From Swiss-Prot:
Residues 147-163 are annotated as: Interaction with DYNLT1. SMART domains: WD40 (SM00320). Residues 2-123 are annotated as: Interaction with DCTN1. This is Cytoplasmic dynein 1 intermediate chain 1. Residues 1-13, 20-58, 189-221 have a biased composition (Basic and acidic residues). InterPro entries: DYNC1I1/DYNC1I2, Dynein_IC, WD40/YVTN_repeat-like_dom_sf, WD40_repeat_dom_sf, WD40_rpt. Residues 96-107 have a biased composition (Low complexity). Homodimer. The cytoplasmic dynein 1 complex consists of two catalytic heavy chains (HCs) and a number of non-catalytic subunits presented by intermediate chains (ICs), light intermediate chains (LICs) and light chains (LCs); the composition seems to vary in respect to the IC, LIC and LC composition. The heavy chain homodimer serves as a scaffold for the probable homodimeric assembly of the respective non-catalytic subunits. The ICs and LICs bind directly to the HC dimer and the LCs assemble on the IC dimer. Interacts with DYNC1H1. Interacts with DYNLT1 and DYNLT3. Interacts with DCTN1. The keyword 4Fe-4S does not apply. The gene is DYNC1I1. The lineage of its organism: Eukaryota, Metazoa, Chordata, Craniata, Vertebrata. It holds the Pfam family WD40. One of its GO terms (biological process) is vesicle transport along microtubule. It comes from Homo sapiens (Human).
Amino acid sequence: MSDKSDLKAELERKKQRLAQIREEKKRKEEERKKKEADMQQKKEPVQDDSDLDRKRRETEALLQSIGISPEPPLVQPLHFLTWDTCYFHYLVPTPMSPSSKSVSTPSEAGSQDSGDLGPLTRTLQWDTDPSVLQLQSDSELGRRLHKLGVSKVTQVDFLPREVVSYSKETQTPLATHQSEEDEEDEEMVESKVGQDSELENQDKKQEVKEAPPRELTEEEKQQILHSEEFLIFFDRTIRVIERALAEDSDIFFDYSGRELEEKDGDVQAGANLSFNRQFYDEHWSKHRVVTCMDWSLQYPELMVASYNNNEDAPHEPDGVALVWNMKFKKTTPEYVFHCQSSVMSVCFARFHPNLVVGGTYSGQIVLWDNRSHRRTPVQRTPLSAAAHTHPVYCVNVVGTQNAHNLITVSTDGKMCSWSLDMLSTPQESMELVYNKSKPVAVTGMAFPTGDVNNFVVGSEEGTVYTACRHGSKAGIGEVFEGHQGPVTGINCHMAVGPIDFSHLFVTSSFDWTVKLWTTKHNKPLYSFEDNADYVYDVMWSPVHPALFACVDGMGRLDLWNLNNDTEVPTASVAIEGASALNRVRWAQAGKEVAVGDSEGRIWVYDVGELAVPHNDEWTRFARTLVEIRANRADSEEEGTVELSA
């Protein structure tokens, strides 16, 4: 309240001062008009004055109008002033002249009023010396006045700063030719403008200097280190740094769905296999067996491999899946996934480039997502009677982009169809039973190219079956007998060309053989018996119609080109250490083949020109099949004759 009362009092004082100023101004105006009227009466009209006298009277009248008396003596005549001839007068002390007359200006009188002492009036005193100006205050008559002195001013010229502006209008030059002097002037102006702009930029940079970052407390550091954003950032960054340390190529490649560039590098000519590289991690691969492998369709340089448990490390997870990268030379996996049961089968989820599916020894189906920074599965199936309760050796995603399912088969003969969006319960389930009483212990499964309904399976008894998912003949169909031991690998023909060979498939077994089959006949077309140990896996080339690869327990990789020879492999190589090779997988382009051994190592070989099909490979392979059928028919006839004899 005291502040408001003080403010009101201050406003009242200001209003009183304004009223006093107005009254003083009005009084002085009336006095001036009265003096003008008196002087007009005293003056006598002169008719024949000269122009000089007339101008003098006008000047005196003008001086009177502003409150200055014209009675002091005339000042010196005016001269043309320039900067060189300009002088300033300063105040010097002089004695007060009692005869001098004073006139106060209204503006000064009003501006000098202050406080409660009333208006303070300043007056101008004209001395007999016209170059001296005396200033006197009515309240300070005893003070000494100041005398004006002469001081010369030094002139300094500064060029005005040129402002250059541009517009988007069409500018047409007025003159097509300029003199050399004009051009030099323009260049000088441009250089000055450029220097000015550079100086301004430097000044701005100096002004915009960032303040030094403050030191984080220990609590803030721990909070950042354990935040989810930091973990995601760190997980991706360490992969980039590893690439940078091991590579000189584009380490910032992002897997965003772009087309794969053809792999650059030296391709070995001829039929010899050339070792490319080895994948092995001292922590995750040691003392583990490679149980399955798969190449990514979306990113052909990525390969996933599954491993069983490490008996020497009981505290480590039993099941491990590692994603390896062929594009970079780093020795660590791109992603590490694990679960609490040995992973017996694994594959990339087709149409879902970020998902990896695994089948475990316990019967669970697990799903990993590389977008999550977690290494454990993001989804898993329940261990219940509705799902699998036996080891799952077969996982496969079949269908199209808009309609696809995950097909899994366990060793108890149960086949389930799943949606990748929900693994809590299968969409369909079927018991693979032969003769409605004998469950099929499935060890391998394969779908023909372009078929999602019919498939073939291999069993522990050595028998091969055809099966169907839907229709009146759903379940086990035909029986193919020929192997004398468990079927370890089965694969359908994959190369697409002018002739359809999708009815062909090959199998491998513990009986040391690889057999060629057709779904049109329940007996093998041919048996390849060049191995001296268990044959653990077999796979057709994805691009060559007559080429397939197989691996055995002696660490040998064989490539068979049936157009060249059916008795011995076209190319063969034994890995270092002679460890048993468990799995073989072709890359999508058919130029590399990867094999996994019992020591947890993955070996990648370049196939070279052997894998490149010629235009006549399909017709040659068709003739080869005709010859194989003819030889089989002859052998069957000979066997029949011998039995009858």
